[in-house]
């Protein structure tokens, strides 16, 4: 629950982290956006939180996660990395499901939601890029 995260990560314990959740209903359900979980993590110091509203197909969320992580490792911002995945797999999981030949999608589409600093980058990747630029 949001209360758990708020209590567990007080005083900036998550300083500058990027949190990617591939769980169902992280940002709410039945099409109703609920940012309480993300807000709790951001109040604990997270730079950016990405998750899904509604129930999400596992393969879609896992594929989006891998695409996002790989782009973050390549130096993209969180927004750029998620956009890369969206371009690859579709704006929501029902688009992805139908493109896979699915015939009976679930009732409400799931899509990624971002909160916090969408321009955040992985610190180690950013530090390496900065040192490369300084050397040049």
Region locations from a protein language model:
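Active-site-proximal C-terminal subdomain of hydrolase catalytic domains
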Residues: 18-130
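Long, soluble alpha-helical segments
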Residues: 131-135
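Mobile, glycine- and charge-enriched loop segments
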Residues: 1-28
């Amino acid at each position: 629950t949001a209360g758990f995260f708020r209590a567990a990560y007080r005083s900036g314990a998550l300083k500058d982290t990027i949190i990617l959740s591939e769980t169902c209903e992280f940002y709410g359900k039945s099409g109703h956006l609920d940012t309480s979980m993300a807000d709790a993590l951001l109040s604990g110091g997270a730079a950016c939180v990405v998750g899904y509203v509604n129930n999400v197909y596992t393969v879609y969320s896992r594929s989006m996660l891998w695409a996002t992580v790989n782009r973050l490792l390549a130096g993209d911002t969180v927004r750029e990395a998620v956009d890369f995945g969206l371009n690859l797999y579709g704006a929501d999981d029902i688009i992805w499901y139908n493109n896979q030949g699915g015939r009976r999608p679930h009732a409400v589409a799931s899509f990624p939601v971002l909160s916090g600093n969408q321009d955040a980058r992985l610190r180690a990747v950013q530090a390496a890029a900065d040192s490369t630029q300084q050397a040049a």
